[in-house]
């Protein structure tokens, strides 16, 4: 019989004993996700992250997370015109338990896009790269469909190639004009009611009647250097201290404060 050490007994544990299961949620913390001040609903949800441990800082794990929220939830409005628009918000900074986000893009839901595509009409799309006044480079996509004239007896409403080109040119002109003259906050305020698409629909009536004109997607291609003061201003927290002026104290001429013996 071979004489030797029993490795299982020497470690002080029984063979086959299960390891104690620790709930991973006990090591995590909840943070509130805050939307910028352009939206009616500021508190859009909560997010989880592992607690700060050693060199791993919790706030660094939260930065650059992207949250996709329906416009109906952001505006606290169940209007059908808002429910199919999705806004992407990116976490840029953490203040206490609040995650401050900024605009990162916009999109339409897939079911809305598919419901608009029908037979007997022409689909017209355009996209353009434009820069805002505060240095954001955006790629804006627009979509529209030809509309049948009320007086027409024809089943179809196809636009000619020259008309499609003219409409696409008009789309690019209006998007460029509206975005280049605005900063990011003003652009988002224009996207909320989709005023750019309404301007395009109105301007193209002379070329060919359109309907279902929407800004289909907005991508943020480039951003300026991050500045915390601008982000706080976007969230309405950028003001300094109190605006009240200090009270004036009258002192006699030649007044000197008393010398303190101990400090």
UniProtKB/Swiss-Prot annotation:
SMART domains: Ribosomal_S3Ae (SM01397). Component of the small ribosomal subunit. Mature ribosomes consist of a small (40S) and a large (60S) subunit. The 40S subunit contains about 33 different proteins and 1 molecule of RNA (18S). The 60S subunit contains about 49 different proteins and 3 molecules of RNA (28S, 5.8S and 5S). It comes from the Eukaryota. Its main location: cytoplasm. This is Small ribosomal subunit protein eS1. InterPro entries: Ribosomal_eS1, Ribosomal_eS1_euk. GO terms for molecular function: structural constituent of ribosome. Residues 236-254 have a biased composition (Basic and acidic residues). It is found in: Cytoplasm. Keywords: Cytoplasm, Ribonucleoprotein, Ribosomal protein. Residues 236-263 are annotated as: Disordered. One of its GO terms (cellular component) is cytosolic small ribosomal subunit. Belongs to the eukaryotic ribosomal protein eS1 family. It comes from Periplaneta americana (American cockroach). One of its GO terms (biological process) is translation.
């Amino acid at each position: 019989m071979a004489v030797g050490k029993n490795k299982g007994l020497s470690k002080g544990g029984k063979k086959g004993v299960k390891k104690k299961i620790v709930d991973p949620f006990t090591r995590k913390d909840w943070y509130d996700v805050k939307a910028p001040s352009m939206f009616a609903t500021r508190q859009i949800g909560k997010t989880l992250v592992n607690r700060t441990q050693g060199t791993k800082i919790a706030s660094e794990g939260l930065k650059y997370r992207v949250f996709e929220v329906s416009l109906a939830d952001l505006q606290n409005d169940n209007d059908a015109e808002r429910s199919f628009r999705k806004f992407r918000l990116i976490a840029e900074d953490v203040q206490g338990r609040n995650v401050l986000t900024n605009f990162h893009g916009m999109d339409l839901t897939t079911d809305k896009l598919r419901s608009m595509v029908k037979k007997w009409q022409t689909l017209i799309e355009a996209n353009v790269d434009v820069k805002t006044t505060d240095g954001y480079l955006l790629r804006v996509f627009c979509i529209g469909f030809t509309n049948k004239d009320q007086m027409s007896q024809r089943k179809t409403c196809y636009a000619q190639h020259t008309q499609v080109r003219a409409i696409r040119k008009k789309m690019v002109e209006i998007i460029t004009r509206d975005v280049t003259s605005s900063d990011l906050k003003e652009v988002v305020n224009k996207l909320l009611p989709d005023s750019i698409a309404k301007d395009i629909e109105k301007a193209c009536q002379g070329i060919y009647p359109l309907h279902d004109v929407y800004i289909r997607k907005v991508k943020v291609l480039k951003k300026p250097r991050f500045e915390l003061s601008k982000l706080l201003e976007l969230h309405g927290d950028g003001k300094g201290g109190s605006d009240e002026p200090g009270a004036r104290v009258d002192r006699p001429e030649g007044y000197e404060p008393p010398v303190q013996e101990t400090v």
